[in-house]
Amino acid sequence: MNTQRAKDISESAAMAYVTYEGVPIYIQHVNEDKETARIFPIGNPQFEQEVLLSDLQEHF
């Protein structure tokens, strides 16, 4: 996923269907310099992690 799209999703009030390793996730924050995102699985905020943006997949 590109940086701008990830930022748009993280700042939007609408939920986008994005997955990490096949698991639906919520994007909390995007780090443009490192090209990473802080994410957690939907419904499991205790499993927060930082991942590469390139590992995120948006589904339409």
Curated annotation (Swiss-Prot):
It is found in: Spore core. One of its GO terms (cellular component) is endospore-forming forespore. Signal peptide: none annotated. Induction: Expressed only in the forespore compartment of sporulating cells. Pfam families: SspH. Belongs to the SspH family. This is Small, acid-soluble spore protein H. The lineage of its organism: Bacteria, Bacillati, Bacillota, Bacilli, Bacillales. The gene is sspH.
